[in-house]
Protein backbone atom coordinates (compact mmCIF):
# COMPACT_ATOMS: atom_id res chain seq x y z
CA UNK A 1 0.00 0.00 0.00
CA UNK A 2 1.49 3.30 -0.99
CA UNK A 3 0.72 6.89 -0.11
CA UNK A 4 -1.08 7.44 -3.39
CA UNK A 5 -3.73 4.92 -2.35
CA UNK A 6 -5.10 7.38 0.20
CA UNK A 7 -4.14 10.86 -0.96
CA UNK A 8 -7.35 11.60 -2.88
CA UNK A 9 -9.20 14.45 -1.15
CA UNK A 10 -12.35 13.34 0.61
CA UNK A 11 -15.39 15.59 0.60
CA UNK A 12 -16.94 16.54 3.90
CA UNK A 13 -19.89 14.16 4.46
CA UNK A 14 -23.30 15.77 4.02
CA UNK A 15 -26.76 14.53 4.80
CA UNK A 16 -28.15 12.65 1.82
CA UNK A 17 -31.66 11.32 1.10
CA UNK A 18 -32.27 7.86 2.51
CA UNK A 19 -31.26 5.13 0.05
CA UNK A 20 -33.86 2.88 -1.52
CA UNK A 21 -34.81 -0.28 0.33
CA UNK A 22 -31.89 -2.71 0.23
CA UNK A 23 -29.49 -0.18 -1.34
CA UNK A 24 -26.19 0.73 0.29
CA UNK A 25 -25.23 4.39 0.84
CA UNK A 26 -22.65 5.92 -1.46
CA UNK A 27 -19.12 5.31 -0.20
CA UNK A 28 -16.76 8.28 -0.19
CA UNK A 29 -13.96 7.17 2.14
CA UNK A 30 -11.58 4.20 2.13
CA UNK A 31 -12.77 1.12 3.99
CA UNK A 32 -9.67 -0.78 5.11
CA UNK A 33 -9.75 -4.26 6.63
CA UNK A 34 -6.79 -5.04 8.88
CA UNK A 35 -6.47 -8.81 9.27
CA UNK A 36 -4.38 -9.65 12.34
CA UNK A 37 -2.54 -12.92 11.73
CA UNK A 38 0.61 -12.41 13.79
CA UNK A 39 -0.18 -14.50 16.85
CA UNK A 40 1.61 -17.73 17.73
CA UNK A 41 -0.92 -19.12 20.20
CA UNK A 42 0.65 -20.93 23.13
CA UNK A 43 -2.60 -22.87 23.60
CA UNK A 44 -2.44 -24.23 20.05
CA UNK A 45 0.15 -26.46 18.40
CA UNK A 46 3.43 -24.48 18.70
CA UNK A 47 4.82 -26.22 15.62
CA UNK A 48 1.84 -25.34 13.41
CA UNK A 49 0.69 -21.70 13.47
CA UNK A 50 -3.10 -21.83 13.65
CA UNK A 51 -3.49 -19.17 10.94
CA UNK A 52 -2.06 -21.64 8.43
CA UNK A 53 -3.95 -24.72 9.60
CA UNK A 54 -6.39 -25.97 6.97
CA UNK A 55 -10.10 -25.97 7.79
CA UNK A 56 -12.56 -27.09 5.15
CA UNK A 57 -9.66 -27.48 2.73
CA UNK A 58 -8.44 -23.89 3.11
CA UNK A 59 -5.99 -22.18 5.50
CA UNK A 60 -7.73 -20.31 8.31
CA UNK A 61 -6.15 -16.98 7.32
CA UNK A 62 -7.57 -17.34 3.80
CA UNK A 63 -11.10 -17.73 5.12
CA UNK A 64 -10.74 -14.38 6.87
CA UNK A 65 -9.15 -12.60 3.92
CA UNK A 66 -11.85 -14.04 1.64
CA UNK A 67 -14.60 -12.45 3.73
CA UNK A 68 -13.24 -8.94 3.11
CA UNK A 69 -12.07 -9.62 -0.44
CA UNK A 70 -15.63 -10.55 -1.38
CA UNK A 71 -17.21 -7.51 0.28
CA UNK A 72 -17.73 -4.86 -2.41
CA UNK A 73 -17.59 -2.09 0.20
CA UNK A 74 -14.08 -2.94 1.42
CA UNK A 75 -11.50 -1.06 -0.64
CA UNK A 76 -8.21 -2.31 0.83
CA UNK A 77 -6.85 -5.14 2.98
CA UNK A 78 -3.77 -5.06 5.20
CA UNK A 79 -2.50 -8.38 6.54
CA UNK A 80 -0.36 -8.36 9.70
CA UNK A 81 1.75 -11.49 10.18
CA UNK A 82 4.39 -13.07 12.34
CA UNK A 83 7.73 -12.74 10.53
CA UNK A 84 8.19 -16.52 10.80
CA UNK A 85 5.26 -17.16 8.45
CA UNK A 86 5.51 -14.11 6.24
CA UNK A 87 6.78 -16.12 3.29
CA UNK A 88 3.96 -18.65 3.53
CA UNK A 89 1.31 -15.93 3.77
CA UNK A 90 2.78 -14.02 0.82
CA UNK A 91 2.67 -17.22 -1.22
CA UNK A 92 -0.95 -17.86 -0.24
CA UNK A 93 -1.98 -14.32 -1.15
CA UNK A 94 -0.40 -14.74 -4.57
CA UNK A 95 -1.91 -18.17 -5.18
CA UNK A 96 -5.40 -17.05 -4.14
CA UNK A 97 -5.25 -14.01 -6.42
CA UNK A 98 -6.43 -11.50 -3.84
CA UNK A 99 -6.82 -8.09 -5.50
CA UNK A 100 -7.43 -5.99 -2.38
CA UNK A 101 -4.42 -7.03 -0.29
CA UNK A 102 -2.20 -3.97 -0.57
CA UNK A 103 0.54 -4.95 1.85
CA UNK A 104 1.65 -7.65 4.28
CA UNK A 105 3.50 -6.29 7.30
CA UNK A 106 5.17 -7.77 10.36
CA UNK A 107 3.28 -7.64 13.63
CA UNK A 108 4.51 -7.50 17.21
CA UNK A 109 4.72 -9.75 20.23
CA UNK A 110 1.24 -8.80 21.45
CA UNK A 111 -2.01 -8.13 19.62
CA UNK A 112 -1.84 -4.46 20.59
CA UNK A 113 1.60 -4.23 18.97
CA UNK A 114 0.27 -5.65 15.71
CA UNK A 115 -2.60 -3.17 15.60
CA UNK A 116 -0.20 -0.33 16.37
CA UNK A 117 2.06 -1.45 13.51
CA UNK A 118 -0.89 -1.40 11.11
CA UNK A 119 -1.99 2.06 12.27
CA UNK A 120 1.55 3.41 11.87
CA UNK A 121 1.72 2.02 8.34
CA UNK A 122 -1.65 3.53 7.42
CA UNK A 123 -0.62 6.91 8.82
CA UNK A 124 2.57 6.80 6.77
CA UNK A 125 0.51 5.91 3.68
CA UNK A 126 -1.52 9.08 4.20
CA UNK A 127 -4.89 7.53 4.94
CA UNK A 128 -7.54 10.19 5.73
CA UNK A 129 -8.77 10.68 9.29
CA UNK A 130 -12.32 9.70 8.37
CA UNK A 131 -11.34 6.39 6.76
CA UNK A 132 -13.19 3.37 8.12
CA UNK A 133 -10.88 0.78 9.67
CA UNK A 134 -12.12 -2.77 10.33
CA UNK A 135 -9.73 -4.76 12.55
CA UNK A 136 -10.31 -8.50 12.43
CA UNK A 137 -8.75 -11.55 14.07
CA UNK A 138 -7.56 -13.90 11.33
CA UNK A 139 -8.49 -16.83 13.56
CA UNK A 140 -12.18 -15.90 13.33
CA UNK A 141 -12.56 -17.42 9.86
CA UNK A 142 -16.34 -17.45 9.57
CA UNK A 143 -17.32 -13.81 9.95
CA UNK A 144 -20.63 -13.12 8.21
CA UNK A 145 -21.00 -10.52 5.48
CA UNK A 146 -23.83 -9.02 7.54
CA UNK A 147 -21.35 -8.33 10.35
CA UNK A 148 -18.96 -6.61 7.94
CA UNK A 149 -21.75 -4.52 6.41
CA UNK A 150 -23.10 -3.69 9.86
CA UNK A 151 -19.67 -2.55 11.00
CA UNK A 152 -19.28 -0.25 8.00
CA UNK A 153 -22.78 1.16 8.47
CA UNK A 154 -22.27 1.75 12.21
CA UNK A 155 -19.39 4.11 11.46
CA UNK A 156 -21.83 6.46 9.74
CA UNK A 157 -23.26 7.25 13.19
CA UNK A 158 -20.42 6.38 15.58
CA UNK A 159 -16.64 6.56 15.49
CA UNK A 160 -16.23 3.10 17.04
CA UNK A 161 -18.12 -0.19 16.86
CA UNK A 162 -17.59 -3.84 17.64
CA UNK A 163 -19.24 -7.02 16.52
CA UNK A 164 -20.55 -8.84 19.59
CA UNK A 165 -22.80 -11.77 20.37
CA UNK A 166 -25.38 -11.64 23.15
CA UNK A 167 -24.34 -13.84 26.05
CA UNK A 168 -26.63 -16.77 26.77
CA UNK A 169 -24.84 -17.45 30.06
CA UNK A 170 -24.95 -15.44 33.25
CA UNK A 171 -21.67 -13.56 33.61
CA UNK A 172 -20.00 -13.18 37.01
CA UNK A 173 -17.65 -10.31 37.86
CA UNK A 174 -15.16 -11.46 40.48
CA UNK A 175 -12.46 -10.26 42.83
CA UNK A 176 -9.70 -11.96 44.82
CA UNK A 177 -10.32 -13.09 48.39
CA UNK A 178 -7.43 -15.05 49.79
CA UNK A 179 -6.54 -17.83 47.38
CA UNK A 180 -9.94 -17.85 45.72
CA UNK A 181 -12.06 -15.77 43.40
CA UNK A 182 -15.38 -14.59 44.80
CA UNK A 183 -18.36 -13.02 43.09
CA UNK A 184 -18.31 -9.23 43.22
CA UNK A 185 -21.40 -8.55 41.10
CA UNK A 186 -23.72 -10.13 38.56
CA UNK A 187 -24.61 -7.88 35.61
CA UNK A 188 -28.01 -8.28 34.01
CA UNK A 189 -27.69 -10.84 31.24
CA UNK A 190 -29.48 -8.71 28.58
CA UNK A 191 -26.63 -6.21 28.98
CA UNK A 192 -23.81 -8.72 28.52
CA UNK A 193 -22.22 -9.55 25.17
CA UNK A 194 -19.24 -11.59 24.01
CA UNK A 195 -16.86 -9.41 22.04
CA UNK A 196 -15.99 -10.59 18.54
CA UNK A 197 -14.40 -8.99 15.49
CA UNK A 198 -14.25 -7.02 13.29
CA UNK A 199 -13.90 -4.05 15.59
CA UNK A 200 -14.32 -0.89 13.58
CA UNK A 201 -13.24 2.71 13.92
CA UNK A 202 -12.79 5.96 12.12
CA UNK A 203 -9.04 6.21 11.68
CA UNK A 204 -8.62 9.40 13.73
CA UNK A 205 -10.40 7.81 16.70
CA UNK A 206 -8.43 4.59 16.92
CA UNK A 207 -5.17 6.38 16.17
CA UNK A 208 -5.77 8.90 18.98
CA UNK A 209 -6.75 6.15 21.42
CA UNK A 210 -3.57 4.21 20.67
CA UNK A 211 -1.44 7.33 21.04
CA UNK A 212 -2.88 7.80 24.54
CA UNK A 213 -2.47 4.12 25.42
CA UNK A 214 1.17 4.17 24.32
CA UNK A 215 1.96 6.36 27.32
CA UNK A 216 0.75 3.64 29.71
CA UNK A 217 3.33 0.81 29.90
CA UNK A 218 1.05 -1.30 32.11
CA UNK A 219 -1.87 -1.39 29.71
CA UNK A 220 -2.20 -4.63 27.74
CA UNK A 221 -5.63 -4.76 26.08
CA UNK A 222 -6.94 -7.98 24.58
CA UNK A 223 -8.85 -6.14 21.89
CA UNK A 224 -9.01 -2.73 20.25
CA UNK A 225 -12.41 -1.71 21.57
CA UNK A 226 -11.04 -1.57 25.09
CA UNK A 227 -8.40 0.95 24.02
CA UNK A 228 -11.18 3.33 23.00
CA UNK A 229 -13.35 2.55 26.05
CA UNK A 230 -10.47 3.18 28.47
CA UNK A 231 -8.75 6.14 26.83
CA UNK A 232 -11.63 7.85 25.04
CA UNK A 233 -14.48 7.19 27.50
CA UNK A 234 -16.69 9.85 25.93
CA UNK A 235 -16.71 8.00 22.60
CA UNK A 236 -19.62 5.53 22.52
CA UNK A 237 -18.87 2.14 20.97
CA UNK A 238 -21.78 0.70 19.00
CA UNK A 239 -22.69 -2.99 19.11
CA UNK A 240 -23.04 -4.79 15.77
CA UNK A 241 -24.86 -8.10 15.89
CA UNK A 242 -22.52 -11.08 15.67
CA UNK A 243 -23.09 -14.81 15.40
CA UNK A 244 -22.19 -17.90 17.37
CA UNK A 245 -20.42 -19.25 14.28
CA UNK A 246 -17.99 -16.31 14.36
CA UNK A 247 -15.86 -18.29 16.77
CA UNK A 248 -12.22 -17.66 17.59
CA UNK A 249 -10.04 -20.70 17.01
CA UNK A 250 -7.88 -20.77 20.12
CA UNK A 251 -7.03 -24.42 20.87
CA UNK A 252 -6.88 -27.68 18.95
CA UNK A 253 -10.24 -28.56 20.53
CA UNK A 254 -11.83 -25.79 18.42
CA UNK A 255 -10.89 -27.43 15.12
CA UNK A 256 -13.73 -30.02 14.99
CA UNK A 257 -16.29 -27.25 15.54
CA UNK A 258 -14.62 -25.15 12.85
CA UNK A 259 -14.70 -28.08 10.44
CA UNK A 260 -18.44 -28.52 10.99
CA UNK A 261 -19.06 -24.82 10.32
CA UNK A 262 -16.89 -24.93 7.19
CA UNK A 263 -18.76 -27.99 5.94
CA UNK A 264 -22.08 -26.21 6.40
CA UNK A 265 -20.83 -23.09 4.58
CA UNK A 266 -19.35 -25.07 1.69
CA UNK A 267 -22.57 -27.04 1.36
CA UNK A 268 -24.77 -23.99 0.91
CA UNK A 269 -26.49 -23.44 -2.44
CA UNK A 270 -25.77 -19.84 -3.60
CA UNK A 271 -29.03 -19.72 -5.61
CA UNK A 272 -31.08 -20.83 -2.60
CA UNK A 273 -29.31 -18.26 -0.42
CA UNK A 274 -30.04 -15.48 -2.93
CA UNK A 275 -33.68 -16.57 -3.10
CA UNK A 276 -33.93 -16.56 0.70
CA UNK A 277 -32.43 -13.06 0.89
CA UNK A 278 -34.93 -11.82 -1.70
CA UNK A 279 -37.85 -13.30 0.25
CA UNK A 280 -36.55 -11.66 3.43
CA UNK A 281 -36.30 -8.25 1.73
CA UNK A 282 -39.81 -8.57 0.30
CA UNK A 283 -41.19 -9.58 3.69
CA UNK A 284 -39.44 -6.65 5.33
CA UNK A 285 -40.82 -4.22 2.73
CA UNK A 286 -44.33 -5.64 3.13
CA UNK A 287 -44.10 -5.27 6.89
CA UNK A 288 -43.11 -1.61 6.59
CA UNK A 289 -46.00 -0.92 4.19
CA UNK A 290 -48.51 -2.26 6.72
CA UNK A 291 -47.22 -0.24 9.68
Curated annotation (Swiss-Prot):
It catalyses: 2-C-methyl-D-erythritol 4-phosphate + CTP + H(+) = 4-CDP-2-C-methyl-D-erythritol + diphosphate. The keyword Nucleotidyltransferase applies. CDD domains: CDP-ME_synthetase. Residues 1-23 are annotated as: Disordered. The record marks 189, 248 as: Positions MEP for the nucleophilic attack. Keywords: Isoprene biosynthesis, Nucleotidyltransferase, Transferase. GO terms for biological process: isopentenyl diphosphate biosynthetic process, methylerythritol 4-phosphate pathway. Pathway: Isoprenoid biosynthesis; isopentenyl diphosphate biosynthesis via DXP pathway; isopentenyl diphosphate from 1-deoxy-D-xylulose 5-phosphate: step 2/6. GO terms for molecular function: 2-C-methyl-D-erythritol 4-phosphate cytidylyltransferase activity. The record marks 43, 50 as: Transition state stabilizer. Its EC number is 2.7.7.60. It is an enzyme of class 2 (transferase). Catalyzes the formation of 4-diphosphocytidyl-2-C-methyl-D-erythritol from CTP and 2-C-methyl-D-erythritol 4-phosphate (MEP). Belongs to the IspD/TarI cytidylyltransferase family. IspD subfamily. This is 2-C-methyl-D-erythritol 4-phosphate cytidylyltransferase.
